[in-house]
Regions:
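A cytosolic small-molecule/anion-sensing beta-strand core signal
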Residues: 55, 84-85, 100-101, 119
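Short beta-strand His + acidic residue motifs that chelate non-heme Fe in jelly-roll/DSBH
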Residues: 70-72, 90-91, 107, 112-118
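Glycine- and acidic-residue-biased ligand/ion/polar-headgroup-sensing regions
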Residues: 66, 76-89, 93
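Short acidic-glycine-tyrosine-enriched beta hairpin
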Residues: 93-109
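A short, N-terminal "cap"/entry segment at the start of jelly-roll beta-barrel domains
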Residues: 1-56, 140-145
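Double-stranded beta-helix
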Residues: 3, 26, 118-145
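Conserved short histidine dyad/triad with adjacent acidic residue
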Residues: 43-45, 58-75
């Protein structure tokens, strides 16, 4: 497997980081510190960094300030959200779940949802990225009753 790196950008000028290889170790403490030190965190209500990206899957570390909201959206893939710090509220059209440190939520594709930070929060978003047109079990809002 070819190793893939993310090149430095104006957002993250301190060099490249490993994005994909046969095995990738991810230092969440280091990435959490990094996103809290970046200009985006200081000047907006959120910041995020992709810590792994390969065909079919992406892992993103997301930081939200208290009361920051990711407005209603859908994702064409399965997702999991795992809270590292803080507390978030995830709301679909029919259900809500408050998650704290050590708690997770899994959500099927194309379910409209939003995320609200009840406290300053850090969480991992893992998502599949190749479901479009695939024959997977389809769920929609009515299945969430």
């Amino acid at each position: 497997m070819e190793k893939k790196f993310n090149a430095a950008t104006t957002q993250r000028p301190h060099g490249e980081r490993m994005m994909d290889a046969a095995m990738v170790t991810i230092d969440l403490r280091s990435f959490t510190k990094q996103i809290r030190e970046e200009k985006a965190w200081k000047e907006s209500d959120r910041n995020a960094i992709t810590v792994f990206k390969t065909y079919g899957m992406r892992i993103v570390l997301i930081a939200l300030h208290k009361d920051a909201e990711m407005i209603k959206h859908t994702i064409d893939g399965l997702i999991s959200i795992q809270v590292i710090e803080g507390e978030i509220l995830i709301t679909t059209e029919k259900q809500s779940a408050e998650l704290g440190p050590g708690e997770m939520l899994a959500l099927h594709q194309n379910i409209p949802h939003n995320v609200l930070a009840k406290k300053e929060s850090i969480f991992l978003l893992t998502l599949t990225t190749t479901l479009a047109g695939k024959n997977f079990q389809q769920y929609d809002q009515k299945d969430m009753d």
